[in-house]
């Protein structure tokens, strides 16, 4: 049997569980894959222009296969990916990630309503895409919400910091970077994250994995200050001298509660109401098939 493949997900829990040997202690045979920082903006000190829409994101990377036993992504994408047969959604756990729409420190935009007609840079078929729509539809008519698909999370941070876009949706470590660099938060868009499991992962392995993460989550809840340094591993070096990770929050929090049928079905209806997926990407599997 192949080893359970664990990937860093831009959050603290996997790093803490690895540091404390929790995966080993629960008897999980695994390998830890450190996801490299690979973005179109990586390795540059400044971004000088904004790209055209990049219509590729979390869902598309799942379609292609991520090479790990379990993938974390926003619950909208995991919901649709599981329905389309790209894995199964683990129904016993979800996460909640702080997220927000930011503008530059000197932006003339002051209120959420000022975002009407303003292109907000998000990641296509990713948490920022859906959470921006969900958050703004409480303030603006749908036809006044405008999006720009600017690539991955770190790409969006670079575009905002370097003044190439008027607004961007950020979460994880980039959320705290934007705060420390003086960017203004116009709307909180905190969202749920789901977990997609591959066909090669057994229930026993998954239960061991989440047992280890539960212990890590308890450690983070008790003393997040001991682990915030791991955020530097998730950020390009250009930001390291500009920030103090000790001032960061803890980021994503894993909630060890079920992701129920009602939420699954309500999420699907909302996605359909926006027409966010073309027919060739839509799945038809219901909760009883898509969720384990």
Language model segments and positions:
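Short, glycine-/small- and polar/acidic-enriched structural segments
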Residues: 1-133, 138, 186
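A ligand-binding cleft/hinge motif common to bilobed small-molecule-binding domains
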Residues: 72-84, 133, 161-183, 269-270
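Pocket-lining segment of extracytoplasmic ligand-binding domains
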Residues: 147-148, 152-234
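Secondary-structure end/capping motifs
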Residues: 204-278
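Conserved C-terminal helix/tail region of periplasmic/extracytoplasmic solute-binding proteins
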Residues: 272-292
């Amino acid at each position: 049997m192949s080893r359970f493949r664990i990937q860093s997900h831009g959050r603290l829990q996997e790093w803490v569980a690895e540091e404390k040997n929790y995966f080993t202690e629960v008897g999980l045979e695994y390998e830890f894959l450190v996801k490299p920082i690979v973005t179109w903006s990586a390795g540059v000190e400044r971004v000088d222009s904004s790209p055209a829409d990049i219509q590729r994101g979390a869902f598309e990377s799942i379609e292609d296969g991520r090479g790990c036993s379990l993938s974390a992504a926003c619950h909208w994408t995991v919901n649709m990916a599981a329905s389309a047969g790209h894995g199964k959604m683990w129904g016993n756990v979800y996460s909640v990630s702080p997220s927000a729409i930011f503008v530059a420190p000197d932006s003339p935009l002051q209120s959420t309503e000022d975002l009407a007609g303003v292109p907000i840079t998000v990641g296509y078929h990713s948490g920022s895409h859906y959470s921006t729509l969900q958050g703004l539809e409480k303030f603006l008519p749908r036809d006044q919400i405008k999006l720009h698909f600017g690539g991955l999370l770190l790409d969006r941070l670079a575009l905002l910091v370097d003044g190439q876009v008027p607004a961007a949706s950020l979460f994880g470590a980039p959320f705290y970077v934007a705060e420390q660099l003086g960017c203004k938060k116009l709307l909180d868009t905190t969202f749920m994250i789901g977990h997609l499991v591959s066909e090669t992962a057994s229930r026993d392995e998954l239960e061991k994995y989440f047992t280890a993460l539960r212990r890590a989550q308890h450690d983070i809840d008790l003393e997040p200050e001991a682990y915030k340094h791991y955020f530097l591993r998730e950020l390009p070096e250009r930001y390291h001298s500009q920030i103090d990770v000790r001032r960061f929050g803890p980021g994503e929090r894993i909630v060890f509660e079920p992701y129920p049928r009602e939420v699954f079905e309500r999420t699907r209806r909302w996605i359909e109401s926006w027409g966010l997926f073309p027919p060739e990407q839509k799945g038809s599997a219901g909760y009883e098939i898509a969720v384990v």
